[in-house]
Amino acid sequence: RDYTKIFDAIYHAKRVLTYGSGSSQTRVASEMKRIFLPHKLFINLHGHDMSQAIEKKVQQDDVIFLISLSGESDHMIDLAKNLRMKGAFLISVTRMSSNQLALYCNDSLYIESTHMKVGDYGDYESATPYFILIELLYIALCFAAAIAI
């Protein structure tokens, strides 16, 4: 897959914001900010109350990563619709499936999640693929930047 569009958007962005819809997604957004921060101003926003702040302050030269498990949460879909109207470049990060969130984003990244039954505790879905994805994205972006120099 060619990630040039995403790399160009990040390179030209004034700010890159990350927003996770749940606790695991918020941890992924926080880790994304940590590893990318030396190269770009990354802002990690979390909590439903912060979505209103994003909507008010977003600019056309912002890139926003919207990290969601299913991509079907009404909150995330409404947020994407509103941010899209403001002209920001949106990238969804969801599990591999056709989903509503991806429809409102300029580009999408997908993970293949693993479900496990954990005794009597029910199903468990690993967040590890999200962390692998953002780390690979970071490495690829560093290589792309090195080639451009």
Describe the residue ranges of each PLM region:
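Glycine-rich phosphate-binding loops that contact phosphosugars or nucleotide phosphates
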Residues: 11-132, 136-145
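A short, well-structured juxtamembrane/interface segment
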Residues: 1-12
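Active-site C-terminal subdomain of aminotransferase-like
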Residues: 149
